[in-house]
Amino acid sequence: EAGHPTVAICAPNDAGSMFTEMADTVVMLKGETIAETYLDQQQIIQAALDTGATAIHPGFGFLSERAEFAKAVQAAGLTWIGPSAMAIEKMGDKMTARQTMRAAGVPVIPGEEVEEADEDSALEALRQAAERVGYPLLLKASSGGGGKGMRAVHDPADFDSAAAGARREAVAAFGDGRIYIERLLSGSKHVEIQVLADQHGRTVHLGERECSVQRRHQKVFEEAPGPTMNETLREAMGQAAVAAAEAVNYVGAGTVEFLLAPTGEFFFLEMNTRIQVEHPVTELVTG
């Protein structure tokens, strides 16, 4: 649409897909598995160099939130279309993200971060933090996503088994067993704000998408404008999302997720440092 010639990379089983039909040039990646194709950083960078491409857009999924890939692209003399490696790292680690947002004045869900790596020390620190935060609460993996490494705890008697289970799942899924605690805000809505930022320090928000209908912490559908929003709340949440993006010098399209409590208060959940598959919902609303 912008008139720039494009190169698409694809695995053999994606040959002929719509995204390849829309590109000017297609490079077939060698390999059969995802690890051998869409996760092969060097092969992707080499495809860009071989075709004379000057920039790489990571799309969504796969390498789109890998800080080391952003660094590798830039080291190869190519332009990385997206946020800096620093922004990806800060927002990708949920405990660091909470601390960064707190410092930026963005409201975060009441809770505590526990940095202990040792299993026994971590569990004891989590127990003490749970007493301060209060029940019901959520245990969440610092590197988590998609509901993995997450446990709701309503009774202190269930805490130890839930914490141990969350840590095991987090290590298996992400190689990182660090867990933090958040107050469980029952009856809350899940609302995300679309932000866009350029390389000159200008950041805007494009309103919200409500994604409260979920199954196993996975979004089922998104709605825009959000049915529970009003203009005052939209602007307040939008400005908080802008502040979140500016706190890490964000560049590109991103999504800041919030919990909207029944009281009307809202709290930062996380930031997705990439374009999302839900982005077209916002495009339909904004044109």
Report each predicted region and the residues it spans.
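N-terminal beta-alpha lobe that positions the nucleotide/phosphoryl donor
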Residues: 1-256, 260-285
